[in-house]
Structures are given as structure tokens and as C-alpha cells.
């Protein structure tokens, strides 16, 4: 299957979320998978002695991480940020974009899961610069890459109308302000933490 790496992103309406989140046969992820992801993030941050009191989920979708983080980090306040007017009306999320969202204060943990591939190069770069401003300590980033499309994802369940880039495109930009702890979790360079040599990626 050929894919145009510059195809425009779809509208994030009810039809989109019905296909990729609400229909079992076509959904891209499950609550159980997202719970494992939240548990992994929480474990890495606990191991690194990074306290989390405020979480920003930038591109929170239907909020699968909200309940999961409530279980793994019960003292943390969760804020869901979403561009979709449909989801903001349904779930009462904060409407906005990771490209230019500017809250009064940064969050201890920012999550940006499967968002950046929907942005063109200019907006994706702006979003990554803004993520550093939004993040007080830790950032979790996941984005569908060219390698993922070719070798890892289930294409029948994965939206291909995205901007597929090499993973290094993201990593180069993240490394300007963050150190990678592993499994998509990044720590701001100006945050004090003991990172054992062999545990760093």
C-alpha cells in the first residue's frame, strides 16, 4: 500500500472517533493498552523521583488516559486539551492546540500521544517548542513514524492521513531541551534528577 507522506489530516468529528475509538473492530487502541501506558509512565517517573501533581494530556481524545492516571498517580490533577469541538462538547475538555496553548503555569507531566503526525512540519516544530514551555519536568511523546507505518502498526486500524516523518526528526528536536529516560518519556535538562548511566537511552 502506498501512502502520500503529506496527506492532510482529517476532521476530528464524531465519524473519526467512532471509527478509531468507539468501534471494537476498527479502534486503534483500548482502555487496557492505555492503562499499561499510564502505568509505565508513572513507574518511570517514580523510579526517577519525579513528583507529579499536575498532568496535561495534549490531544487527549476520548480521555483514555484520564482514568488510568487517576489510578497510577491519584494525587495528580488531570487537564485534557483537545482541538476537536465534538470531543470538547462531549467531555468538557479544554479546547486548544498544542501548537500555541499557553496556560498560566506548566505541568509536571505533559503527554502528547499520537498528535504530532497530524501537524505539518511547521506546526509540528512549533508544537515541540511549545511542549518545552508546557512541561515543568517530564514529557511523554509518541508519534506515528515512517518506520512504524512500514513495520509496526496495524494499517487496517491506523489512520494513514498523516504526515509520516522519520523518528529522528522528532528526537533531534526533543534533545535540544530534554534527556530521554526511555519508552517515550523525556525529562527537561534543567530538572535535577539522578539518571544512572546504563538506564539512560
Predicted regions span which residues?
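Conserved active-site beta-strand-loop modules that form the wall/rim of enzyme catalytic pockets
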Residues: 108
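Short catalytic micro-motifs in class I SAM-dependent methyltransferases
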Residues: 114-118
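A conserved beta-strand element that flanks and buttresses the S-adenosyl-L-methionine
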Residues: 111
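Class I (Rossmann-like) S-adenosyl-L-methionine-dependent methyltransferase catalytic domain
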Residues: 1-105, 119-126, 130-201
Amino acid at each position: 500500500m502506498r501512502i502520500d507522506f503529506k496527506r492532510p489530516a482529517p476532521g476530528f468529528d464524531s465519524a473519526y472517533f467512532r471509527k478509531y475509538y468507539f468501534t471494537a473492530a476498527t479502534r486503534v487502541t483500548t482502555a487496557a493498552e492505555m492503562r499499561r501506558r499510564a502505568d509505565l509512565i508513572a513507574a518511570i517517573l517514580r523510579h526517577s523521583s519525579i513528583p507529579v501533581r499536575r498532568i496535561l494530556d495534549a490531544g487527549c481524545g476520548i480521555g483514555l488516559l484520564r482514568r488510568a492516571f487517576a489510578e497510577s498517580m491519584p494525587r495528580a490533577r488531570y487537564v485534557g486539551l483537545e482541538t476537536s469541538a465534538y470531543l470538547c462538547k462531549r467531555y468538557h475538555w479544554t479546547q486548544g492546540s498544542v501548537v500555541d496553548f499557553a496556560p498560566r503555569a506548566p505541568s509536571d507531566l505533559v503527554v502528547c500521544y499520537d498528535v504530532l503526525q497530524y501537524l505539518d512540519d511547521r506546526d509540528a516544530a512549533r508544537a515541540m517548542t511549545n511542549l518545552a514551555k508546557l512541561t515543568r519536568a517530564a514529557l511523554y511523546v509518541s508519534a506515528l513514524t515512517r518506520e512504524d507505518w512500514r513495520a509496526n502498526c496495524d494499517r487496517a486500524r491506523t489512520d494513514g492521513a498523516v504526515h509520516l516523518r522519520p523518528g529522528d526528526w522528532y528526537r533531534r528536536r526533543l534533545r535540544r531541551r530534554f534527556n530521554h529516560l526511555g519508552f517515550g518519556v523525556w525529562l527537561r535538562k534543567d530538572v535535577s534528577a539522578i539518571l544512572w548511566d546504563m538506564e539512560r537511552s
